[in-house]
């Protein structure tokens, strides 16, 4: 047998071993109906595994145990092996989105099912298999390299699919207060599109939301001079807002975009001018524009149109995350090399998509990259992931650890 055939045979055996271990742990996690913000015991499973691998595990609870909704208590897991730098941290979430009507699923969403080459379950792609893959990768890595350089950590929350106020952001605040720094962060979100590893996210756009309230004066449609129509007052300003050019983007980010997602007004009667209008819009912005610049330009537009209006406007702003970017460097290179070694793919860097918990970690100075399974079915009925990708992903993750923590 040639050296090439020996290497290929060894790689196939490694993938098979990783695949079964990752599949088994994935199923154990997927059986838990951990609809946000309920972890439902997933982190206990991980803590037990990681403790056996030499990790110090710490549960962090934030929020009100008696509350419901966005202020409910959230369980988070911080696990670390090693006390030196660099620190490579895997960030993930055990919570999942609701299933919708389970009758629409081919297989029960919390009964993991293998069929047609896929593992079907809520959370299969987003993102319990990613957590399982990195856990297996870390176990194998520390078993083979017990004296490795640096440290390996896990930051796992059950508040990523919800309001994200008592999860990763609070854990990061605690770590910062302890001067416990993350050097490299690998977020296990499903980044791949057509094939495993074809895309990794080395940044994300910022997200700035706004709720516009326009207040006029209610009246009869036949007597507009006795009323002030908030719809008419808002229309021109909103039109200019949607047609404005905020920036031209750059090599890493597309131009900043704005989308109006909701407009609501009216009294239910066809002959009444309403008193108020509410509009909801969102900016996805690049590093070429700041939060303050977007707010200032928006207010300038509305101030101009409302200067001579009897109506008044107010905007309530909510920043969900600043844009962040990890330039090509050690972490990006480690990911690209590991992907190439396992799949033969030349990966593409991207900053597209929505926000992730990476937005809370990047401001600490950490390099942040998102790498996970394909995202074709996330948040959908019949969410699924290719079984063959599980072992490959674990092997990629292990390769990243080797690239960063071995001399």
Swiss-Prot record:
One GO molecular-function annotation for this sequence? zinc ion binding
The record's active-site residues are 95, 160
Record-listed Zn(2+) 2 binding positions: 126, 161, 379
Catalytic reaction annotation: N-succinyl-(2S,6S)-2,6-diaminopimelate + H2O = (2S,6S)-2,6-diaminopimelate + succinate
Q: Does the keyword section mention rRNA processing?
A: no
Superkingdom field: Bacteria
Name the pathway it acts in.
Answer: Amino-acid biosynthesis; L-lysine biosynthesis via DAP pathway; LL-2,6-diaminopimelate from (S)-tetrahydrodipicolinate (succinylase route): step 3/3
What are the names of the required cofactors? Zn(2+); Co(2+)
- Which Pfam family, giving just one, matches this sequence? M20_dimer
Q: Which InterPro entries match?
A: Bact_exopeptidase_dim_dom (IPR036264), DapE_proteobac (IPR005941), Peptidase_M20 (IPR002933), Peptidase_M20_dimer (IPR011650), Peptidase_M20A (IPR050072)
Instruction: Give UniProt keywords alphabetically.
Output: Amino-acid biosynthesis, Cobalt, Diaminopimelate biosynthesis, Hydrolase, Lysine biosynthesis, Metal-binding, Zinc
Extract the signal peptide range.
Answer: none
EC nos: 3.5.1.18
Q: Which family does it belong to?
A: Belongs to the peptidase M20A family. DapE subfamily.
Entry-linked PANTHER family: ACETYLORNITHINE DEACETYLASE, N-ACETYL-L-CITRULLINE DEACETYLASE
Q: What is its biological role?
A: Catalyzes the hydrolysis of N-succinyl-L,L-diaminopimelic acid (SDAP), forming succinate and LL-2,6-diaminopimelate (DAP), an intermediate involved in the bacterial biosynthesis of lysine and meso-diaminopimelic acid, an essential component of bacterial cell walls.
Q: How does it assemble?
A: Homodimer.
Q: What is this protein called?
A: Succinyl-diaminopimelate desuccinylase
Name its species.
Psychrobacter cryohalolentis (strain ATCC BAA-1226 / DSM 17306 / VKM B-2378 / K5)
The taxonomic lineage of its organism, from the top, reads:
Bacteria, Pseudomonadati, Pseudomonadota, Gammaproteobacteria, Moraxellales
């Amino acid at each position: 047998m040639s050296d090439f055939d020996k290497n290929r045979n060894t790689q196939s055996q490694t993938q098979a071993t990783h695949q079964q271990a990752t599949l088994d742990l994935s199923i154990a996690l997927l059986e838990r109906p951990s609809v946000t913000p309920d972890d439902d015991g997933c982190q206990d499973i991980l803590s037990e595994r990681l403790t056996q691998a030499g990790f110090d595990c710490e549960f962090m609870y934030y929020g009100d145990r008696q509350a419901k909704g966005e202020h409910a208590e959230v369980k988070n897991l911080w696990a670390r092996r090693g006390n030196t730098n660099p620190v490579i941290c895997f960030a993930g979430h055990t919570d999942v989105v609701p299933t919708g009507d389970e009758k629409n699923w081919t297989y029960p969403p919390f009964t993991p099912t293998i069929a047609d080459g896929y593992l079907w379950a809520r959370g299969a792609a987003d993102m319990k298999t990613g957590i399982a893959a990195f856990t297996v990768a870390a176990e194998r890595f520390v078993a083979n390299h017990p004296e490795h350089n640096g440290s390996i950590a896990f930051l796992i929350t059950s508040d990523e699919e919800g309001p994200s106020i008592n999860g990763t952001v609070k854990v990061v605040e605690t770590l910062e207060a302890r001067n416990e720094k993350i050097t490299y962060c690998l977020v296990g979100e499903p980044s791949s599109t057509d094939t495993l590893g074809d895309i990794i996210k080395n940044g994300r756009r910022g997200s700035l939301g706004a709720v516009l309230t326009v207040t006029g004066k209610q009246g009869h449609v036949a007597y507009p001079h006795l009323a002030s129509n908030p719809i008419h007052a808002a229309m021109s300003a909103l039109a200019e807002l949607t047609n404005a050019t905020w920036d031209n983007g750059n090599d890493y980010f597309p131009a900043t975009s704005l989308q109006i997602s909701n407009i609501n007004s009216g009294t239910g009667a066809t002959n009444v001018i309403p008193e108020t209008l509410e509009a909801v819009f969102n900016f996805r912005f690049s590093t070429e524009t700041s939060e303050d610049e977007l707010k200032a330009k928006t207010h300038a537009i509305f101030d101009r149109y409302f200067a001579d209006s009897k109506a008044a406007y107010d905007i309530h702003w909510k920043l969900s995350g600043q844009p962040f970017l990890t330039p090509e460097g050690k972490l990006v290179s480690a990911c690209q090399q590991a992907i190439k070694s396992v799949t033969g793919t030349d990966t593409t860097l991207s900053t597209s998509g929505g926000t992730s918990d990476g937005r809370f970690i990047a401001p600490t100075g950490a390099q942040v990259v998102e790498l996970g399974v394909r995202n074709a079915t996330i948040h959908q009925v019949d969410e699924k992931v290719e079984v063959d990708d599980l072992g490959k992903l674990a092997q990629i993750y292990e390769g990243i650890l080797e690239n960063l923590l071995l001399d």
